[in-house]
Regions:
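Short, solvent-exposed secondary-structure boundary/capping segments
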Residues: 45-49, 81-91
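Extended Gly/Ser/Thr-rich low-complexity repeat segments
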Residues: 58-67, 97-109
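Residue-level recognition of beta-strand microenvironments
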Residues: 40, 77-79, 92
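Short conserved beta-strand and strand-loop elements enriched in small hydrophobics
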Residues: 21-27, 56-69
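Short strand-connecting beta-turns/loops that link adjacent beta-strands
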Residues: 29, 42, 52-54, 79-82
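Short beta-strand-centered aromatic/proline hotspots
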Residues: 35, 71-77
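N-terminal helix initiation/capping motif
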Residues: 1-42, 101, 105-114
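Short, surface-exposed secondary-structure edge patches
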Residues: 13, 48-54
C-alpha cells in the first residue's frame, strides 16, 4: 500500500544533513536531472541543482541509500535562489518509506541531525 507522508502534523519530521555530495536523480517530464542532496527527512528534502529546473513542480525521485534505493513522487517548492530546491514527498511505497526511515535513523546515530 502506498504511503503518503503527512506534513500537517505538530511535530516536525527529523531532518539530517547529507554528507559527501550524495546524488539524487529526478525525472522531470522525461528529462533525467541529477542534483546534490543537501538535507532529507521522511517528508522531503533539499536538492542543489547546477542550474534552474524551470517551472517543474512534480517529479519522480530516485535516491540510493545504505538501506537500498528509495523511489518516490515529489513536489518541488519555491526555490530561494534558483538552484537549491526544497521538495516534499507526495507518494512513497511502504518499502521505500521503510528504507528511508531506516537510513535517516542511521544518519542521526552518526551525528548528521540537522
Amino acid at each position: 500500500m502506498p504511503h503518503f507522508p503527512q506534513t500537517q502534523t505538530k511535530t516536525r519530521s527529523p531532518r539530517v544533513r547529507v554528507p559527501n555530495s550524495e546524488s539524487i536523480r529526478f525525472n522531470l517530464g522525461g528529462r533525467q536531472v541529477s542534483a546534490v542532496l543537501q538535507k532529507i527527512s521522511l517528508t522531503g528534502g533539499l536538492a542543489e541543482f547546477t542550474a534552474s529546473i524551470g517551472s517543474a513542480t512534480i517529479a519522480e525521485a530516485k535516491l540510493n541509500t545504505i538501506s537500498g534505493q528509495v523511489n518516490g513522487l515529489v513536489e518541488f517548492l519555491p526555490s530561494p535562489d534558483g538552484t537549491a530546491y526544497p521538495f516534499r514527498f507526495i507518494a512513497l511505497s511502504d518499502d521505500d518509506y521503510e528504507r528511508l526511515s531506516s537510513t535517516i535513523k542511521v544518519m542521526q546515530q552518526q551525528g548528521f541531525g540537522a
